[in-house]
């Protein structure tokens, strides 16, 4: 449905709604994950375009959760708890090599740049990195410690789904785009129903720890 993709690109949330996460210190000695971030929560419905409301409602369907179960070989009764967020990255922003939290089953990254606002040569690809089973998840390898096993594509209405394991290292090298351009992705995270996720739900938070009743984020 290229026409729906085009509409979603046109209707992406305004960067003014996003929280800056540039230069934040990370655990285990890992370099920062530089981005502007907007966490989906129900309060956002009032400011999202109809195209995005419809897309998110579709992603919350049982059909999409069943897609996750089929892709990762889960049973039909395995709980799949979804969280979603937009990330925009300006020139120079990067995501250092890391694995995701154990509560995550995996991530599905949708890329929302077009040839009108992005070039593949500027970067932004999600890199799949092989550590040869040598690096513990709570560590900070650099690119020279890892082998690049694959990379996503940014343009062409692409998405990229991967499972979380103790060795599912991935990263994004510093994007090299002109000023005023942004790498734009929307990420759906599938989470396990862990004690942490249950406790967060009891406290009115989503699986990522954001308050479900929170208002629209603004800088």
Predicted regions and their residues:
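Non-heme Fe(II)/2-oxoglutarate
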Residues: 1-70
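Short, cationic low-complexity segments
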Residues: 133-137, 203-219
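Amphipathic alpha-helical surface "interface" segments used
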Residues: 27-34, 89-90, 206-213
């Amino acid at each position: 449905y290229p026409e729906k993709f085009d509409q979603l690109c046109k209707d992406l949330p305004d960067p003014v709604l996003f929280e800056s996460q540039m230069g934040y210190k990370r655990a285990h000695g890992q370099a920062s994950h530089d981005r502007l971030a907007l966490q989906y929560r129900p309060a956002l419905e009032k400011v999202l375009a109809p195209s995005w409301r419809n897309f998110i409602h579709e992603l919350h369907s049982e059909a999409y959760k069943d897609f996750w179960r089929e892709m990762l070989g889960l049973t039909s009764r395995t709980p799949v708890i979804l969280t979603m967020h937009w990330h925009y990255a300006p020139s120079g922003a990067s995501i250092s090599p890391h694995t995701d939290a154990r509560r995550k089953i995996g991530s599905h990254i949708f890329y929302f740049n077009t040839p009108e606002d992005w070039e593949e040569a500027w970067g932004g690809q999600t890199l799949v990195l092989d550590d040869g089973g040598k690096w513990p998840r709570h560590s900070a390898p650099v690119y020279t410690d890892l082998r690049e096993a694959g990379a996503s594509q940014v343009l062409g209405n692409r998405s990229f789904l991967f499972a979380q394991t103790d060795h599912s290292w991935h990263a994004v090298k510093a994007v090299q785009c002109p000023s005023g351009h942004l790498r734009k992705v929307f990420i759906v995270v599938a989470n396990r129903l862990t004690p942490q996720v249950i406790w967060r739900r009891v406290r009115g938070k989503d699986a990522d720890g954001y308050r479900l009743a929170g208002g629209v984020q603004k800088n």
